[in-house]
Amino acid sequence: MNDLEREIEFLLIDQKQDWKLARENYGSLTNVQTRYFQDDYRTTILQFNPERIRSSAAKIDKASLLARPCFFCHRPEEQKGVTYNDAFEILVNPYPIFEDHLTVPLRWHEKQQIKPYYEDMLDIVSDLSDYALFYNG
């Protein structure tokens, strides 16, 4: 485990313990139902998380999105993070779908785009090799 992974591990422990929203939502992961399907080449994991309906049912029309403040720029005071490469902040996701669910936004507000950040994402997965990365933009 490298220094960054150790720092992230402590962040996860602290946030799940000290931040009520994170503590409650990580606690609700006990309600997740999981099935595993195995074939000769892979294991597929199917997950049903009843709490995800909140974000799945959120309004995403243009007017609703414009009316909603950026949740990375307007973070709760309790949400702590770890700075990564001066450009990113590694945060514990308070609405998890996995036991150790992180989110990695830029440290400044910018339109979501992946193209300029491919190399950074490769660096992140290299530095946090125990984690999977997906882009949700």
Question: Where are these predicted regions, by residue range?
Answer:
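Active-site microenvironments that recognize anionic phosphate/pyrophosphate groups
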Residues: 1-116, 128-131
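A gly/proline- and charged-residue-enriched helix-loop-helix capping module
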Residues: 120-122
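A short glycine-rich, hydrophobically flanked beta-strand micro-motif that places a catalytic Asp/Glu
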Residues: 131-137
